[in-house]
Amino acid sequence: MAQETLVDTSIQGKIVQCIGAVVDVEFARNQMPKIYDALKMEGSSLTLEVQQQLGDGIVRTIALGTSDGLRRGNIVYNTGANITVPVGKATLGRIMDVLGAPIDERGPVDQTLTAPIHRKAPAYDELSPSQELLETGIKVIDLVCPFAKGGKVGLFGGAGVGKTVNMMELINNIAKAHSGLSVFAGVGERTREGNDFYHEMADSGVVNLDKLEDSKVAMVYGQMNEPPGNRLRVALTGLTIAESFRDEGRDVLFFVDNIYRYTLAGTEVSALLGRMPSAVGYQPTLAEEMGRLQERITSTKVGSITSIQAVYVPADDLTDPSPATTFAHLDSTVVLSRDIASLGIYPAVDPLDSTSRQLSPAVVGEDHYNTARAVQGTLQRYKELRDIIAILGMDELAPEDKLAVARARKIQRFLSQPFHVAEVFTGSPGKYVSLAETIRGFKMIVAGECDHLPEQAFYMVGTIDEAFEKAKKM
């Protein structure tokens, strides 16, 4: 197991109450554990984490594992330290749980280097903002919401609009070409997706099964079937591994799927601890918990962490407290829309709702900026005219509006793109489109150089040249 540290058995307490994942433990008054101390069960690998001090020597803890079989009177030892997990090269190519224990049946993880999962965010004077762009090869993202190297990106979307597929495509396009290291934290998502991800990484060589230390990714999973304590802490475990690589001076990619489940686990734990719920039933400490995690996901003068986080949007409501709290911490937001998905346009990114702090002439250049704004302006005009078209039809529009609608429909279709990870479903090979090609294509459509082509020619192609080729065959 990951936590084979020597435990001081002199500081011991006993369980006085057990309600689901919440366990109350009584110690001598002068030996009360501190908040976030890890406690070990006698004769068991179960770890408890202290959440509250109730007084009279009693602490309230969360079980990081199943609490089946616990009884009042069971002996518990205080380790006197936070939960520590293995970090560094030993984690590469491995799948670990919240405590850093291996779950890939490939032997124990080397414990030479370990780090506590709770630590302070870097000081303000250590931070290093980045102006460098990270090309993703996905047209709509590179054009309207470009990513910064060392920035934070959120993929927002309701159920079934393609968050995980987009995340996998980004991993495919960035992590495989990226010379640095990646850390993937599966927080409360489906085990099947974690399994698929591992096999895909192994097939592409990012995980080197013959020589694990040559792998480029470390994986930490706390999936849907885990107790709330595991799901709440697994993001911190993944982040701790990413921070250790960053502090070695590396550029790290940190993928989290899904931040909403982290919030949800916090809600469950908060209710179990007996705290009064806040807006929409969320924990009163929602903003603080989110801030504590997000403030640590940052780039310093030593190395960078570029994080891409999937964020589930409950009932497609972006004003829900959970996604709304996440928004404030991000540099780029990619909003996936059910309306666009229903048109069959994938990736279903809403170009009018998605934003990026990088989209300014000073960062991306005048050409990119003007093209992106022209594309958004054309789509916005089409959106405004939709009601008129629905009532009166296209014939009643002014000639310039007819032209704007025709171009907007072409832009809309050109924003679609076949993905490498979706080849199995679509049957068409995935396309990686460079930023220069993306700008050239949209510039031509906006300038009217493609007005003679049918709009179907723009659907599910890579570059603008492919659209011309497709039009010839129609």
Curated annotation (Swiss-Prot):
What taxonomic ancestry is recorded? Bacteria, Pseudomonadati, Pseudomonadota, Betaproteobacteria, Burkholderiales
Which InterPro entries did the record assign? AAA+_ATPase (IPR003593), ATP-synt_VA_C (IPR055190), ATP_synth_F1_bsu (IPR005722), ATPase_a/bsu_AS (IPR020003), ATPase_alpha/beta_chains (IPR050053), ATPase_F1/V1/A1_a/bsu_N (IPR004100), ATPase_F1/V1/A1_a/bsu_N_sf (IPR036121), ATPase_F1/V1/A1_a/bsu_nucl-bd (IPR000194)
Q: Does the keyword Coiled coil apply?
A: no
Q: Identify its membrane topology class.
A: Peripheral membrane protein
Assigned keywords, A-Z: ATP synthesis, ATP-binding, Cell inner membrane, Cell membrane, CF(1), Hydrogen ion transport, Ion transport, Membrane, Nucleotide-binding, Translocase, Transport
Q: Name one GO molecular function term.
A: ATP hydrolysis activity
Q: Tell me what reaction this enzyme catalyses.
A: ATP + H2O + 4 H(+)(in) = ADP + phosphate + 5 H(+)(out)
Q: Does the keyword Transferase apply?
A: no
* Name listed for the protein in its UniProt record: ATP synthase subunit beta 1
Q: Where in the cell is it found?
A: Cell inner membrane
- Provide the family line: Belongs to the ATPase alpha/beta chains family.
Instruction: Please state the Enzyme Commission number of this protein.
Output: 7.1.2.2
Record Gene3D superfamilies: 2.40.10.170, Bovine Mitochondrial F1-atpase, Atp Synthase Beta Chain, Chain D, domain 3 (1.10.1140.10), P-loop containing nucleotide triphosphate hydrolases (3.40.50.300)
Assembly behavior: F-type ATPases have 2 components, CF(1) - the catalytic core - and CF(0) - the membrane proton channel. CF(1) has five subunits: alpha(3), beta(3), gamma(1), delta(1), epsilon(1). CF(0) has three main subunits: a(1), b(2) and c(9-12). The alpha and beta chains form an alternating ring which encloses part of the gamma chain. CF(1) is attached to CF(0) by a central stalk formed by the gamma and epsilon chains, while a peripheral stalk is formed by the delta and b chains.
GO cellular component terms, semicolon-separated: plasma membrane; proton-transporting ATP synthase complex
Q: Which domain of life is it from?
A: Bacteria
**UniProt xrefs under NCBIfam families:** atpD (TIGR01039)
SMART domains per the UniProt record, alphabetical? AAA
As for what it does, the entry says: Produces ATP from ADP in the presence of a proton gradient across the membrane. The catalytic sites are hosted primarily by the beta subunits.
**Chain positions recorded as ATP binding sites:** G157, G158, A159, G160, V161, G162, K163, T164
